[in-house]
Every structure is written in C-alpha cells, then in structure tokens.
C-alpha cells in the first residue's frame, strides 16, 4: 500500500504512509500504532508483523506522523506524546480499514508500542464496536488517562520487559483501572524496554499472535 488519505477537518488533509500486508484468507487485521520516535520501518514491529502474517493475520504498519512532523518531533520530542493527535489519526485509519474493500470484512486488532499504546487504547474506547483486541508492547497506557482505561472494552494484553521496572509499574497501575474482564499483563523474563535480548521479540510475537487468535473471531 502506498499512502492513506486522512481528512483531519473540513479544509485539512494529511497523507500518511503505511504498509498493508494481507496473507491468503486472513482471520483479521492488526493495525500497528508505533511509539516514540518510531514508524513503519521499525525493525521490531516489522518482525512482529511478519510473524502475525505467518499466523494468518493481515497487518497495517503505519506512520502516525508525516515526514515533516517526524523531523520536527526528532528535535522537540513533543508530537510523540500528543496522544490526542496520534489517536485521532489512528481512529481515521481504523475507519479507512473498515471501509476499504480489501479489509472491510476483517476483525480489527490494535498493536501499540510505547506512546502508540496509549493512542490504541483511546481509539479502542472510541470505537468499542470495532476494535476486538489490543496488545501493548512496552507501552505507556498511563498516557491514555484513567477515564479511557475504564472505558476500554476490548480484551487487552500488556507485554512488558521484566527488566523495565518503571514501565512495569506504569502498566500494573493502568491495569487496575481497566474495567474489561479480559485483561492481562505478561512480563517477559530477562527483557528490557526494547526487547533486544535474544529470543525476547519472538516471545512478544508469539504471545501477541495467541491473544489476537483468541479474540479476532
């Protein structure tokens, strides 16, 4: 896929770049909300997406910031924390997916990383009848806010590196506010924030595939 056309307002439009991969007879589609300073070229998210494709799930790797915005964010580090902006664009992307003839019959799941996890939670709360499941990798669910956490109904899995204590605490606290009965936090033994240790990203991909496989029916 080349570009997605997202209309932000009556007189404003933004073009976002994304990569859409659809295996044969997919069981659902996973939209990736990338985290701080990351995008569709992230090797970690590409790895997870490929594993999900192998498991029969379509994937959409998306840049939630334009190239100009990404350049600005690399200098200011502000837009990556603008959860309102990121979630608005993610919601528009979900609507695009549900109206696209190649994907409109697929159940939707969200995979959020870092600040992208907060955007995924906001989008899931807004589109509760559309989003079927969420997986967060090293996410910042606290940035979504308590009210959003209480509003999310989709089954939600938080994956956090065992050796990432600050993010572990943030995820454990966020989980307490979630009202959905299907919620879980899994600590990946020996993993740090980026899951760069051997075999740890494979564990993330495997757990994500199982979670989505259970709820994207």
Regions found by a protein language model. Give the residues of each.
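Serine-hydrolase catalytic machinery in alpha/beta-hydrolase-like enzymes
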Residues: 7-103, 199, 203
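Alpha/beta-hydrolase fold nucleophile elbow
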Residues: 102-114
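Active-site loop->helix "elbow" adjoining a glycine-rich segment at hydrolase catalytic centers
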Residues: 114-117, 163
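A conserved short beta-strand
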Residues: 129-141
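Short beta-strand/loop motif that positions the catalytic acidic residue
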Residues: 152, 158-160
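Conserved alpha/beta-hydrolase "acid-adjacent" motif
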Residues: 165-170
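Catalytic histidine neighborhood in serine/cysteine hydrolases
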Residues: 178-194
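Post-His helix in hydrolase/transferase enzymes
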Residues: 196-210
């Amino acid at each position: 896929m080349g570009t997605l056309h997202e209309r932000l307002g009556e007189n404003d439009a933004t073009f976002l770049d994304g990569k859409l991969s659809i295996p044969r007879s997919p069981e659902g589609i996973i939209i990736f909300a990338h985290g701080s300073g990351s995008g569709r070229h992230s090797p970690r998210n590409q790895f997870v997406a490929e594993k999900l494709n192998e498991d029969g799930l379509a994937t959409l790797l998306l840049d939630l910031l334009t190239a100009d915005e990404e350049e600005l964010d690399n200098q200011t580090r502000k837009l990556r924390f603008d959860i309102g902006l990121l979630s608005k664009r993610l919601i528009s992307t979900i609507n695009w997916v549900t109206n696209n003839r190649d994907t409109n019959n697929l159940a939707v799941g969200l995979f959020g990383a870092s600040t992208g996890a907060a955007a995924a939670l906001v989008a899931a709360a807004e589109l509760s009848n559309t989003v079927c499941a969420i997986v967060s990798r090293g996410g910042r669910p606290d940035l979504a806010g308590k009210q959003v956490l209480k509003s999310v109904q989709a089954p939600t899995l938080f994956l956090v590196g065992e050796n990432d204590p600050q993010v572990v605490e943030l995820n454990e606290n966020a989980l307490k506010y979630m009202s959905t009965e299907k919620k879980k936090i899994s600590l990946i033994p020996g993993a740090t924030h980026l899951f760069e240790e051997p075999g740890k990203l494979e564990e993330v991909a495997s757990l994500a595939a199982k979670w989505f496989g259970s709820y994207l029916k």
